[in-house]
């Protein structure tokens, strides 16, 4: 009985020490500041396949790059708010802070307003920091769907411009009629309500107008790379990969 008791005490002690060690490591990770990162902005109208190209690039380069989609981050943050609301679980300060950002996004969308650029940039930097902690300290990022206009540019330069370096802007260009065909085909399987003719054309025109200052600014700075997306994804990727390899040199 005594030996059993000692074993139990020893086991309990080891478990406690292990938990303490994990907590210390966790706190160290949380406190570790993300260094300056290399950033590539990836823009293009809906249906150009820019997200697919980012995924192919991550795979080809063995995770040298991390792909962050603005749209995916926004949707994930909204879902966190919904999940937390259902579970009524927002006790810790860090969770409350995270949910606060998501709640602001949810409030904007519910009110039919655009999410402020400052919130979008905060969300991107949060995603970068999380990816840095979880993905072997990766410091090279493909920001998919950003920037979408002058407001995005201004917010990025104000909040991140002094720290992270934008080395290129990949602009995937494709004729409107080709994109309409692609998105209508996608709509047959996706069930997305925004994959209809009227909405697709409106989204395309909105993108063209909003993206003008983005293309002008980075074109003037020599950072813009226009990529013809009216080809097979393999042909498009060949050009994408060549550009990224050129950037690295």
Give short role names for the model-derived ranges.
Residues 1-249:
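Glycine-rich phosphate-binding loop of ATP-dependent small-molecule kinases
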């Amino acid at each position: 009985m005594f030996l059993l008791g000692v074993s139990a005490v020893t086991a309990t002690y080891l478990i406690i020490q292990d938990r303490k060690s994990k907590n210390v490591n966790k706190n160290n990770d949380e406190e570790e500041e993300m260094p300056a990162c290399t950033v590539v902005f990836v823009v293009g109208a809906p249906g150009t396949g820019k997200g697919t190209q980012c995924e192919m690039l991550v795979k080809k380069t063995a995770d040298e790059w991390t792909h962050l989609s603005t749209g995916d981050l926004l949707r994930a943050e909204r879902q966190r708010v919904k999940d937390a609301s259902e579970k009524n679980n927002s006790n810790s300060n860090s969770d409350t802070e995270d949910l606060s950002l998501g709640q602001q996004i949810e409030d904007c969308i519910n009110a039919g307003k655009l999410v402020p650029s400052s919130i979008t940039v905060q969300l991107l930097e949060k995603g970068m920091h999380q990816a840095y902690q979880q993905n072997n300290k990766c410091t090279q990022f493909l920001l998919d769907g950003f920037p979408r206009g002058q407001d995005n540019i201004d917010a990025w330069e104000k909040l991140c411009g002094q720290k992270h370096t934008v080395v290129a802007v990949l602009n995937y260009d494709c004729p409107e009629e080709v994109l309409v065909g692609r998105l209508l085909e996608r709509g047959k399987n996706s069930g997305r309500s925004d994959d209809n003719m009227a909405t697709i054309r409106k989204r395309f025109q909105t993108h063209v107008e909003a993206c003008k200052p983005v293309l002008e600014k980075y074109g003037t700075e020599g950072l813009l790379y226009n990529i013809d997306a009216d080809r097979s994804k393999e042909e498009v990727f060949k050009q994408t990969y060549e550009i990224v390899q050129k950037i690295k040199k």
